[in-house]
């Protein structure tokens, strides 16, 4: 009977130890996933800012190019 008690306690102890190790591992993985999510959100935010800045620059360059072309045409017509 004492042998069965010792065996049962040993099995329960080893089960608890392995369970706690798994929980710690899971918590570490969850923390890493949260950090990765935060970094990817920051990257997405930066990308959208860069994209918006690019769009604004493209609009400004189109306006400038249009004005330059209009000025060149006006000069060409003025010379004739």
Swiss-Prot record:
It is found in: Secreted. GO terms for biological process: defense response to bacterium. Expressed by the skin glands. GO terms for cellular component: extracellular region. It holds the Pfam family FSAP_sig_propep. Residues 23-42, 79-80 form a propeptide. Residues 29-40 have a biased composition (Acidic residues). The modification Leucine amide is found at residue 77. The keyword Nuclease does not apply. Its main location: secreted. Residues 24-48 are annotated as: Disordered. Keywords: Amidation, Amphibian defense peptide, Antibiotic, Antimicrobial, Cleavage on pair of basic residues, Secreted, Signal. InterPro entries: Dermaseptin_dom, Frog_antimicrobial_propeptide. The keyword Secreted applies. Residues 1-22 form the signal peptide. Coiled coil: none annotated. Belongs to the frog skin active peptide (FSAP) family. Dermaseptin subfamily. Possesses a potent antimicrobial activity against Gram-positive and Gram-negative bacteria. Probably acts by disturbing membrane functions with its amphipathic structure. This is Dermaseptin-DA3. It comes from Agalychnis dacnicolor (Giant Mexican leaf frog).
């Amino acid at each position: 009977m004492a042998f069965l008690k010792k065996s049962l306690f040993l099995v329960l102890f080893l089960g608890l130890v392995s369970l706690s190790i798994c929980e710690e591992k899971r918590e570490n993985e969850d923390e890493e996933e949260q950090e990765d999510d935060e970094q990817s959100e920051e990257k997405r935010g930066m990308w959208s800012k860069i994209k918006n800045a690019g769009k604004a620059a493209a609009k400004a360059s189109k306006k400038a190019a249009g004005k330059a072309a209009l000025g060149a045409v006006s000069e060409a017509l003025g010379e004739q």
